[in-house]
Amino acid sequence: MSYPFSGYDIGVLVMTSWVPKPMGHISQAGNYNFPVYYYPVDSTNTTNIHGGDKAILPDLITAAKHLEEMGCKCITSSCGYFAHFQKEIAEAVDISVYLSSITLIPFLIPMLRKDEKLAILCYNKEKLNMELFHSCNVSKKMLERCIIQDVIHEKEFSNIIKDQGHYNITNARKELVDITKDMKKNNNIGAFLLECTDMPPCSYYIQKELNVPVFDATIMVKFLNTIYGRKNK
């Protein structure tokens, strides 16, 4: 197959959102020393993506096929709740699909000692249902090794969904550090996994404070590029 241009190994399905994209956010192109192809899907919003509304699936598949046609070798997304559509989109294209950091759970569980837990920090844990986990090949047995905490009631992070029109990353950072400190205080945590793509700008501070590895969608993109963007050098 011939392409109109080349060099975009990673493609990102982008949910429409007003939230700023600081360094660390998956949709901040300045994070990467390699090109990333961003493709906005106009019919998406926090309601239908977080809720896994199958009515938008045709639009998502069309967008994924566009990324494939443009030469992308791997597709991810700008919101962790795209995981609702992981299975269907993976079946619809002939390139690799990792729509959410949730797809990392089967990779992370084996690294834990038997007495350790994987702490998952998400926006709204009610939206992380078993259908979503199954779509990402995450079993109930794996989830027994996990602790899930959300931030939906935190003042700064709740501004994202409530469309308040303002978002203070410094305050959000403090919220996340405080939450993760409490989680670690009461549990033997071997690693943190951040579902929400608005959280990675805070990953460094969480890891520095707790001295525990923190995995997120932005790190996942960099990892995927080492594979799909491998160079002969």
Task: Outline where the language-model segments fall.
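N-terminal glycine-rich anion-binding loop in soluble enzyme alpha/beta folds
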Residues: 1-55, 124-167
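C-terminal and late-domain segments of enzyme folds
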Residues: 2-6, 189-201, 207, 218-233
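Gly/Ser/Thr-rich loops at beta-strand to alpha-helix junctions
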Residues: 18, 74-85, 98-104, 123-127, ...
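Glycine-rich, highly charged phosphate/nucleotide-binding loops
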Residues: 50-66, 171-179
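N-terminal active-site wall of soluble small-molecule enzyme domains
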Residues: 58-63, 81-88, 92
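Non-catalytic positions within long, well-ordered alpha-helices that form the structural scaffold/packing
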Residues: 68-71, 109, 184-185
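Short, acidic/small-residue loops that bind anionic groups at enzyme active sites
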Residues: 90-112, 207-225
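Charge-patterned, long linear interaction tracts outside catalytic cores
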Residues: 165-204
